[in-house]
Regions:
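Cys-dependent protein tyrosine phosphatase-like superfamily
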Residues: 2-10, 14, 26-194, 198-199, ...
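Sec-dependent signal peptide recognition
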Residues: 13-21
Length: 276
């Protein structure tokens, strides 16, 4: 009876933490942030936040970007977004299609939660009205109130093993993005896959940093420092925690070595690898 009661309390605590995470994300979006989670939200689409992560030249080509909310003055910024993607590709010496003759297909992965309904609706309305321009997906990311580095190793291993049942479910999302870039069926139209939150810093950084650790050899510190450079500040604690949970998932569940999840924020000069 005592054991079952403790298990019940533990599961109830997890549910409370998950609910608080969603509520805190809602508070941030509504107020512009607090002392615990303080992103610079919104604003128009920023060239600084548009970054090329991956390119696959098979077929008509597939590009992967991270961005902030792809809107200007409350409207979906299609032309601006594509022009920023083109310029980032040129900077990386990566080919880019002739937009006039070939056009592009956008695959928009929004990381926003339901509390950002109006921003989600901007994107949904655009793609519903312009189905030839691409497709929209919504995969809400909230991060974690708890850092895995606060836990004992035994507890951390247990929590990490259940990561695919978390709200974010990065063990499912990150490979899905990778598989979309390296599809067995090369696209017949140039395809621009991109993911974003509001500011393109915190939740976007959590996903982007996780992707770079899994597929581009970044350590936890390199992923964290790169995210901070894009954000032009430290990414939010909840997003740091989400990034670290995935770091430990790669370590315990996938056998990755030398990610150094525990020492990700120790001050030192590091070199961030060139992505492309």
């Amino acid at each position: 009876m005592g054991k079952n009661y403790k298990l019940f309390i533990k599961e109830e605590f997890k549910m409370i933490v998950a609910a608080l995470s969603i509520l805190l994300t809602s508070y941030v979006s509504a107020t512009g942030g607090g002392s615990f989670y303080n992103p610079k939200l919104g604003g128009d689409l920023s060239y600084h936040k548009v970054r090329l992560l991956e390119y696959n030249g098979a077929g008509a080509g597939t590009w992967l970007f991270r961005t902030n909310l792809p809107a200007v003055n409350g409207s979906f910024a299609y032309d601006t977004l594509v022009s920023y993607m083109q310029q980032r590709s040129i900077e990386a010496n990566v080919s880019f299609p002739n937009i006039t003759t070939q056009g592009v297909k956008l695959v928009d992965i929004s990381l926003l939660s339901v509390n950002s309904y109006s921003d989600i609706q901007i994107e949904k309305d655009f793609f519903e009205g312009n189905p030839d321009k691409g497709i929209f997906y919504n995969w809400p990311i909230v991060g974690s109130l708890v850092s895995p580095n606060w836990l004992s190793e035994a507890e951390r291993i247990k929590e990490v093993a259940a990561l695919n049942s978390s709200i974010d479910n990065l063990p499912s999302l990150i490979p899905k993005i990778r598989n979309a870039v390296l599809s067995d069926v090369p696209p017949s139209k140039p395809t621009m896959i991109f993911f974003h939150c509001e500011a393109g810093s915190d939740r976007t950084g959590q996903v982007a940093g996780s992707y770079m650790m899994q597929y581009h050899g970044y350590t936890a510190k390199q992923a964290y420092e790169w995210d901070n450079e894009v954000a032009q500040r430290q990414i939010a604690s909840m997003s740091q925690n989400g990034l670290l949970f995935y770091c430990w998932w790669l370590t315990y569940q996938q056998g990755y070595k030398n990610l150094d999840c525990m020492n990700y924020s120790i001050a030192s000069d590091i070199e961030i690898p060139i992505i492309i």
